[in-house]
Amino acid sequence: GFLDSFKNAMIGVAKSVGKTALSTLACKIDKSC
């Protein structure tokens, strides 16, 4: 249903935002960028 697809979209957004945040954090910590 609509709510299921909305929930899946939110989860997808959260995952990609989390990955980006983790990459940025790791970059700042170990200066690998």
From Swiss-Prot:
One of its GO terms (biological process) is defense response to bacterium. Keywords: Amphibian defense peptide, Antibiotic, Antimicrobial, Disulfide bond, Secreted. It is found in: Secreted. It comes from Pulchrana picturata (Malaysian fire frog). Expressed by the skin glands. Disulfide bonds join C27-C33. GO terms for cellular component: extracellular region. Has antibacterial activity against the Gram-positive bacterium S.aureus ATCC 25923 (MIC=36 uM) and the Gram-negative bacterium E.coli ATCC 25726 (MIC=18 uM). This is Brevinin-2PTe. Belongs to the frog skin active peptide (FSAP) family. Brevinin subfamily. It comes from the Eukaryota.
